[in-house]
């Protein structure tokens, strides 16, 4: 029974690691100098930046509801009342209550002054690993990951790190 439990725990850990991990490119097959590392063509996983750098994977985001500035009072305001502040990108402004006929209520709301916004979105793009000829280039067999020095592999960057 204990052997079945240990086998089940190990299989679950293996499945979790293979589902939730990011491939490191070439996977230790000595492709580091051939230039395949930047594109992730090693066969074990895609490059880290290809899924979210403007490729074929659509991304949808939504902002949280704006919270913050609020004024609530049962008092009577006489004279000019001024409230200044900045609201979030998806800001709201609201005045509720009764205004006497002699007074006014006004909200000046503007956006787009250049202080808030998304100025640039850029991805990692496609790496172009440097291949030094037709053989094993620089770092074809480097200090691999998890194997110590002398191990073979790389991280997918084309230099065998």
UniProtKB/Swiss-Prot annotation:
GO BP annotations, alphabetical order: chorion-containing eggshell formation
Keyword field contains Signal: yes
Sequence repeats: 30-34, 35-39, 40-44
Record region (Central domain): 53-121
A GO MF term: structural constituent of egg chorion
Region Right arm (Gly-rich tandem repeats): start-end pairs: 122-161
Job of this protein: This protein is one of many from the eggshell of the silk moth.
Family according to the record: Belongs to the chorion protein family.
Record's protein name: Chorion class B protein L12
